[in-house]
Amino acid sequence: MSPYVLTIMSFSLLLGTTMTLISNHWLTAWMGLEINTLAIIPLMTKPHHPRSMESAIKYFMIQATASMIILFSAIFNASTTNQWMTGQISNTSASFMMTIALAMKLGLAPFHFWVPEVTQGIPLLSGMLLLTWQKIAPISIFYQISPSLNMSLLMILSITSTLLGGWGGLNQTQLRKILAYSSIAHMGWMAIIIMIYPSLTILNLILYLASTITMFMVLNQSSSTKINSLSILWNKSAPNMIIITLTLLSLGGLPPLTGFMPKWLILQELINFNNIPLAMMLALSTLLNLFFYMRIIYSSTLTMFPSINNTKMQWTLYSHKTISPIPTLTIISSLLLPMTPVFITLS
């Protein structure tokens, strides 16, 4: 892809997300979502391959359908309340349709079937954008309309997402599909708390973005797309393998890593609101995700292929120095649990 085209598409992604974040009118928020969708499609089809073209078409159809429902629900709400402000949805039907449309955009179950298939068919860096950057704009709309959402509908979407996100990843061997199902489960955690404690959803999103970006960047650096390809990664790059292990455990929510913080705070808020059965179901569903994270770690560290290298380390000489964000992202995604009181105070 031409550097000029790449620059234009990257700027369009930034513009679309920014428009949605700062807009207080439904039309400009919808325009931002559309710019986001149209900007990422050329990046998804950068290797001109039938699989990537198929994934881009699937993504476009789902996003176009969701955008159509968003626009229709905004017009329907305006026709009954004479309000175009994003934070004001007083019509029950419009709120229901808006929730369904945003669930489609985020990949919440039962509208999640496109997420693993699209992620598997595109390159790793495009998959990283799909599972991270493209979540920001829809969640910002969720945040703005959180007082008008239907709690029962959100509970159904959240529980279904956390359960199916865990079950779907159990029999996967492709790392991109595993991260896609992980994204579905994490979106369920964010959706369940959006009405009760919206600021906690933003905290969860930031930590999820840091962990997922770290995983994708390390996998892209090591050219790993399957679980069995990680078996030889320890001999090629031990630091990358350590980063993958820490990040996966953090995504699974194990203490004392950063990923434990949002799950702990969400369960605490649910218990405070007497939603103990819901908190138990979410906690149990986390075990499904933790199982396939541990399966990756087991396959990559405890079942390594015999090393034919006689030295303790394979030395790799680089002709130029590069500044990588991976160390910083690793610290954010793994070592921020002691900062929990600070985040509670700020939120």
From Swiss-Prot:
An example of a Gene Ontology cellular component annotation for this protein is: mitochondrial inner membrane
Pfam families, A to Z = NADH_dehy_S2_C (PF06444), Proton_antipo_M (PF00361)
State its location(s).
Mitochondrion inner membrane
Q: Its topology with respect to the membrane?
A: Multi-pass membrane protein
Name the keywords, alphabetized. Electron transport, Membrane, Mitochondrion, Mitochondrion inner membrane, NAD, Respiratory chain, Translocase, Transmembrane, Transmembrane helix, Transport, Ubiquinone
Reactions catalysed, as given in the entry: a ubiquinone + NADH + 5 H(+)(in) = a ubiquinol + NAD(+) + 4 H(+)(out)
Q: What is its main location?
A: mitochondrion
Q: Which InterPro entries does the record match to this protein?
A: Complex_I_Subunit_2, NADH_DH_su2_C, NADH_UbQ_OxRdtase_chain2, ND/Mrp_TM
Supply the EC number(s): 7.1.1.2
Record field: transmembrane: 2-22, 25-45, 56-76, 96-116, 122-142, 149-169, 178-197, 202-219, 241-261, 278-298, 326-346
One term of GO molecular function? NADH dehydrogenase (ubiquinone) activity
An individual GO BP term: mitochondrial electron transport, NADH to ubiquinone
Q: What does this protein do?
A: Core subunit of the mitochondrial membrane respiratory chain NADH dehydrogenase (Complex I) that is believed to belong to the minimal assembly required for catalysis. Complex I functions in the transfer of electrons from NADH to the respiratory chain. The immediate electron acceptor for the enzyme is believed to be ubiquinone.
Query: PANTHER family per the record?
Result: NADH-UBIQUINONE OXIDOREDUCTASE CHAIN 2
Please state which protein family the record places this protein in: Belongs to the complex I subunit 2 family.
User: What's the protein called, per UniProt?
Assistant: NADH-ubiquinone oxidoreductase chain 2
